[in-house]
Amino acid sequence: MEPIVYIYQDHLQDFWNSGQSQCFGAAFEWKGEQVYHVYIKYPQVAPTGYSMPCLFRVVDTDDYGKAEDVALSVYASMPEEAKRVPVVIVCIHVEDTKVSSRAFIVDDGRIIEAVVKYVPRKSELYTRSKGLLEVGALESKKVLIVGLGSGGAPIAVELAKAGVGHFILMDFDRIELHNIARHICGVNELGRLKVNAVKDAILLKNPYAQVETYDIDMNKQLDILEKCVAESDLTIVATDEYASRYNINARLVKLGKVGLFGRAIYYA
């Protein structure tokens, strides 16, 4: 099975525009699956997998044709401590503004070329939804979600999948054991603030989304609640507590804003 390397198109373009000829990045492998995700900029969400060194190198037309030799030469010049694990080397070539790349996995001097696949630019990420959803309109919308249990959390992820570009998340609670059976988060996120865990889930679906988080009890900070309601195009009220629902509703009425109310059974 050929290894596969995933590269962000935006990262490649930004690297080329910077004028650098070489830079170090980070790579993460799904152990045993020969799948590697490589980054020039460290991702917003901590990647899954085992980390390893990664190096990006710009090459001319002649060297691009013999990129394997270039990769071996680059590998030979790397410090010995970097060679204790496999290394991903990406050779980048630009012709007529088109950026192309070849990727190699080098392990103890042995080299194998990988299949390169690209994570698309922001403008292309939701092309399959065009015609079904108004993706362009949703990208500019801001949604406030108060309460990130088994109701609010999946709503946040579904909105991210639909192409909503801006989120405000509000919840003071943490992921607890009793949440796991029905929540989008798993046991590896026990103890995390729900706002941070759900933010990561959003960014895994839409890495270009803008996400603000407030790990507060909004009943005690009503000024922040009112500010967030005022900024948002839609407020999702997914709390299971009467005082918070009353306080949010009062601000929705005061500001003439739209809100959707829903709740799950206790302990969800």
Regions inferred by a protein language model and the residue ranges of each:
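ADP-ribose/adenylate-binding Rossmann-like module
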Residues: 234-268
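Hydrophobic/aromatic beta-strand patches that form the interior of the parallel beta-sheet core
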Residues: 88-90, 144, 168-170, 214, ...
